[in-house]
C-alpha cells in the first residue's frame, strides 16, 4: 500500500495562511452545527516540563474523514540538532477505514493554531484595535503574528514578550519582519515590532493579547489589563496550565473552541475550579459566535477571552485540504 506523505517543506509550499484560516473557521462552524465528533485527548509526560506527547483525534462526517494527530515536545532535541516539536497527522476514510495520507504535524499545528488565535481576535477584538502583544517567543509566535496580520492588516504595533528572557524577545522582534516575508509572503512595512522589557506596561497598552506559553502560573495580572482588551489564550492546552490571572475572568465575555476540553485543560480550567468563572458565564463555542447563535462583544470596554486548547478536527481539515490539493 502506497500511502501519500506530505512533508513540512511541502506544507509550507502548498498551504497559505489564508487557506489555514478558512479551514479553521469552517471547522468551528461545523462544530457549532453538531457536524463533528471530538474524542478524548491522550497525554503523557516523559519528563514533566521537558518531554511530553499528546494524541488528539476526531471525525469530520461531511468530509468523510477521521484521524488523529500525535505531537511530541522534546526539549533536549535542540542540543541534538533536531526540532523540539515533532508530529504526524494520519487521515483515514470514514467510509472504508483506509488510510488516505500522512501529513507533517508540527507545520500544520503552527498554521492552524495561528489561525485559531487570529479568528478569536477577528470576532471578539475591537475592530479599531491598533496594538497587539504576543506573549511567548517559541515555535508558535511567527504563526500567530502572520495570522493576526491577515485579519487585522491595519495593526500599527506588535510587541513581543518572553516573560523569562527579555533578550529573546528583542532578538525575535528584530527578525520577525524578514520571517514574515520569507515564510508567509507578508509585507509588514508599516508595522512596528518591539521586544518587551516591561510586561505590565505592554499589557496596559495592548488592544489584542495572544498568549502562547506553557506557563503553569499566571503571567498577566488583572490590574494590568485595560478595558476593551481581547485575549486569545492558546498556550494552556493541558490541565494545570495557566497564562492569565484567574481574577480576569470575574467580568469577561468568554468563548472556547471545545467546551469539554477547555473545562478540563484550557485557560478556563482553573478559574472554574476557583469560582472566579461560573459555567453560565461561558458564552459558547467560537462557532456559535461566528454563526450568530451567541452574542459576543457588546461595547468597546468589554474584556473578551477566546480559550483555545486546539482540536484534531482543525489538523484533519487542513491535512485533508493538502492531501486533496496534492492528488
Q: Where would I find each of the regions flagged by the language model?
A:
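Adenosine-phosphate binding glycine-rich loop
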Residues: 10, 239-327
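Residues that mark the start of a beta-strand
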Residues: 130-131, 157, 302
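Rossmann-like adenosine-cofactor binding region
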Residues: 187-271, 276
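Short helix-loop-beta connector
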Residues: 124-131, 226-227
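Glycine-rich adenosine-cofactor-binding loop
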Residues: 117, 128-152, 162-164
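NAD(P)-binding Rossmann-fold cofactor-contacting core
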Residues: 151-185
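N-terminal ligand-binding/catalytic initiation module
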Residues: 1-110, 116-118, 125-128, 284, ...
